[in-house]
């Protein structure tokens, strides 16, 4: 068989030998060894890992925004990330402009449409409910079916003004009117209170910033235990997503949750230019290292940046190393080296291992990291 690209001598994160062949931008073969010729062959060094391309399901990468912005390839292909999902930076009135720009990126870019029609042009996009127009959201979803993979509602004090839980009620209505499209909900300081938010969320809805260190988070700061209503949401199938961000990941909360048996379903950064350049986020790999230091193992960490986000946002051609899927791969090493990691609240932990992307393959095209 003649392939476009053959990757030799790789191993999965579980340590199993793997070789991958690519033809016409799709995975054509996956096996311990593959024979056959290819236009290009990559021979990996011993101890090099290959996974499905990493997916970051919470980023902000519409470069024309002033508040939260970045450039898809700076947080994507250059960092070992093959696919990013912009989490509601734009709304129905400006998502088409974002779409046009996103098509120029090497990185695969998808978007969640903010239920507020201009997105995050200011911090309080849900303070004026006249900006939430279901018909406009529906139009955006219908006009950009290969780009819009969900909707976003930011449910915290600085965003909602005096509107309480109402914006989330509107978001749930919009979701129901659009074939139960995925919904991501941002949480932060009250109001609204987290128990009100979680009561409205259903199985498959994505709760981002799940391990924030705020009083309105999942941890009861008086008892140092996970709140009962957070467990109820977790057990009914609400998707707990990291969404690290500048203010929204706390080591102690994540460690306490793990001790009690609660794990994030997906790992994401909430990255934008300032927390990329100045920290504490930097990139997806650093966020993955933080979950390793909390106590997650590498195979589950990789699953939480590949298969899990692909399933949550219905990216059916991505997320696994299977024949016929898109030829998006991340090639990386895991080195035994110490590194101090800092969360959003200034807490530090010393990682014993560093994960480093060395090549990113998107649609069969190779990019060095």
UniProtKB/Swiss-Prot annotation:
InterPro entries: Deacetylase_Atu3266-like, EF_0837-like, Metal-dep_hydrolase_composite, Metal_Hydrolase. Zn(2+) 2 binds at residues 152, 186, 209. Gene3D superfamilies: Metal-dependent hydrolases, Urease, subunit C, domain 1. The record marks 154 as: Transition state stabilizer. It holds the Pfam family EF_0837-like_N. The modification N6-carboxylysine is found at residue 152. Its cofactor is Zn(2+). Zn(2+) 1 binds at residues 58, 60, 152, 270. Keywords: Hydrolase, Metal-binding, Zinc. It comes from the Bacteria. Disulfide bonds: none annotated. Binds 2 Zn(2+) ions per subunit. One of its GO terms (molecular function) is hydrolase activity, acting on carbon-nitrogen (but not peptide) bonds. The keyword Disulfide bond does not apply. It is an enzyme of class 3 (hydrolase). Its EC number is 3.1.1.-. Esterase that can catalyze the deacetylation of acetyl-(R)-mandelate, but with very low efficiency (in vitro). Belongs to the metallo-dependent hydrolases superfamily. Atu3266/EF_0837 deacetylase family. This is Deacetylase EF_0837. It comes from Enterococcus faecalis (strain ATCC 700802 / V583).
């Amino acid at each position: 068989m003649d392939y476009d690209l053959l990757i030799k001598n790789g191993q999965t994160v579980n340590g199993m030998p793997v070789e991958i062949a690519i033809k016409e931008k799709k995975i054509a073969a996956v096996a311990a060894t593959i024979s056959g010729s290819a236009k290009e062959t990559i021979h990996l060094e011993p101890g090099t890992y290959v996974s499905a391309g990493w997916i970051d399901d919470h980023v902000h990468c519409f470069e024309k925004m002033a508040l939260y912005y970045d450039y898809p390839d700076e947080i994507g292909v250059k960092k070992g990330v093959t696919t990013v999902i912009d989490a509601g930076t734009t709304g129905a009135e400006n998502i088409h402009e974002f779409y046009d720009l996103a098509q120029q990126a090497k990185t695969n870019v998808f978007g969640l449409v903010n239920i507020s029609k201009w997105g995050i042009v200011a911090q309080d996009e849900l303070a004026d409910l006249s900006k939430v127009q279901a018909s406009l959201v529906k139009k955006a979803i219908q006009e950009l079916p290969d780009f819009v993979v969900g909707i976003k509602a930011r449910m915290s004090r600085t965003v909602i003004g005096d509107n309480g839980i109402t914006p989330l009620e509107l978001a749930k209505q919009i979701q129901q009117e659009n074939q139960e499209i995925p919904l991501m909900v941002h949480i932060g300081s009250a109001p609204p209170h987290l128990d009100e938010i979680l009561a409205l969320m259903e199985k498959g809805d994505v709760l981002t910033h799940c391990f924030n260190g705020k009083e309105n988070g999942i941890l009861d700061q008086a008892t140092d235990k996970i709140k009962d209503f957070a467990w109820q949401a977790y057990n009914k199938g609400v998707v707990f997503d990291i969404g690290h961000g500048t203010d929204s990941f706390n080591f102690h909360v994540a460690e306490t949750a793990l001790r009690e048996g609660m794990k994030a379903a997906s790992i994401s950064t909430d990255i934008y230019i300032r927390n990329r350049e100045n920290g504490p986020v930097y990139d997806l790999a650093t966020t993955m290292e933080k979950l390793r230091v909390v106590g997650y193992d590498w195979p589950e960490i990789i699953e939480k940046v590949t298969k899990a986000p692909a399933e949550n946002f219905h990216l059916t051609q991505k997320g696994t190393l299977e024949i016929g899927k898109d030829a998006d791969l991340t090639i990386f090493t895991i080195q035994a080296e110490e590194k101090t990691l800092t969360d959003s609240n200034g807490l530090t932990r010393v990682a014993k291992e560093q994960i480093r992307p060395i090549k990113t393959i998107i649609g069969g095209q190779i990019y060095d990291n």
